[in-house]
């Protein structure tokens, strides 16, 4: 039997729900608006790129399966066009505003999702201090009463801008030229940064720049690029920061001690990430100690980190771990099992359905999948 046919048969056992869609263009953005819709945006250069607000199939908008539903496809609720490639998009909570970043990275763009039509239109821009041809500002949003946009391409250019007044309310005010890979707002006063080098920091915006940080991810990190995500912030002690290297190294850290990883493991990736800009690690919002990684090939790997505390082999090297689940649908459905297989550009967890993820690839496919934990007791 053809490998693709084998996978289709096996998928009946592997998935509770599975949907495959074709977008008009590849996306690096999957941004939730409530639990029923997502934004996607194209990132091709030298062309207009679509920004779309997609409504999920009705079956995925309910917490329990209650029979058959007629709608089995995404519906386009709103749309617009950007003259730039879009590498990041953030929805400003409790508003109809979006903030996008991409190349050329000389400014951020603010968009409004219309109430009385299906249009997403550009309404303003936010100036960027650091203007470099090859770098684009990372973006995060403080969802306070007066929303603030955190952005920067390097540590020295980090700042928070009030979205309404456009006044700068916080700056790093340092000369450090480290390149950023990700920014994440944790609460009304705190954000996390990850540098491409693996340097991590937690910043309190009520104080001058004095981050709680590590300076590097540890031995063996030369030449790697890194990304990170903080999960379950403020919910007690424990390893709530996951840091992923382009060679498949995955570190879990406790925010109270960023210099000493709680565990350091090696994920089974066949080759280093071909495009470290696409590296992604995410914590499952509805499953304890569960996370997913992508950006190495056409798969998304899901891990249970419950037993990883202190994980190292006797000679001090990192131990290899095996995923709890691997989504290979993009390879067999979109790539037909052929090389080069599609590359996953991003993934995200559904905010309410514990085992449901969305994933997209560079061939413009979008999958929604609810995986079955085959190791769980029946």
UniProtKB/Swiss-Prot annotation:
Gene Ontology annotations of biological process type: cytoplasmic microtubule organization; nucleus organization
Subunit architecture: Interacts with INTS9 and INTS11; the interaction is direct. Part of the multiprotein complex composed of BRAT1, WDR73, as well as integrator complex subunits INTS9 and INTS11.
Gene Ontology CC entries for this record: cleavage furrow; cytoplasm; spindle pole
WD repeats (start-end): 73-113, 121-163, 167-205, 214-255, 266-305, 322-371
The keyword Cytoplasm is assigned to this record: yes
Cellular localization per UniProt: Cytoplasm; Cytoplasm, Cytoskeleton, Spindle; Cytoplasm, Cytoskeleton, Spindle pole; Cleavage furrow
Gene: WDR73
Expression sites (tissue/organ): Expressed in kidney and brain. In the kidney, expressed in glomeruli, most probably in podocytes, and in tubules (at protein level). In the brain, expressed in the cerebellum, with high levels in Purkinje cells and their projecting axons, in the deep cerebellar nuclei and in pyramidal neurons of the cerebral cortex (at protein level). In the white matter, mainly present in astrocytes, but not in oligodendrocytes (at protein level). Also highly expressed in endothelial cells of cerebral capillaries (at protein level).
Keywords for this protein: Cytoplasm, Cytoskeleton, Disease variant, Epilepsy, Intellectual disability, Repeat, WD repeat
GO molecular function: protein-macromolecule adaptor activity
Keyword check for Cytoplasm: yes
Reported effect, residue 201 to E: In GAMOS1; uncertain significance
Effect of residue 8 to E: Abolished interaction with INTS9 and INTS11
SUPFAM superfamilies found in the cross-reference section: WD40 repeat-like
Superkingdom of source: Eukaryota
Pathological condition linked to this protein in its record: Galloway-Mowat syndrome 1: A form of Galloway-Mowat syndrome, a severe renal-neurological disease characterized by early-onset nephrotic syndrome associated with microcephaly, central nervous system abnormalities, developmental delays, and a propensity for seizures. Brain anomalies include gyration defects ranging from lissencephaly to pachygyria and polymicrogyria, and cerebellar hypoplasia. Most patients show facial dysmorphism characterized by a small, narrow forehead, large/floppy ears, deep-set eyes, hypertelorism and micrognathia.
Major location category of this protein: cytoplasm
Protein name: Integrator complex assembly factor WDR73
Family statement drawn from the similarity comment of this UniProt entry: Belongs to the WD repeat WDR73 family.
InterPro entries assigned: WD40/YVTN_repeat-like_dom_sf, WD40_repeat_dom_sf, WD40_rpt, Wdr73
Function: Component of a multiprotein complex required for the assembly of the RNA endonuclease module of the integrator complex. Associates with INTS9 and INTS11 in the cytoplasm, stabilizing the INTS9-INTS11 heterodimer and blocking the active site of INTS11. BRAT1 then joins the complex and plugs the active site of INTS11, leading to WDR73 release and nuclear import of INTS9 and INTS11.
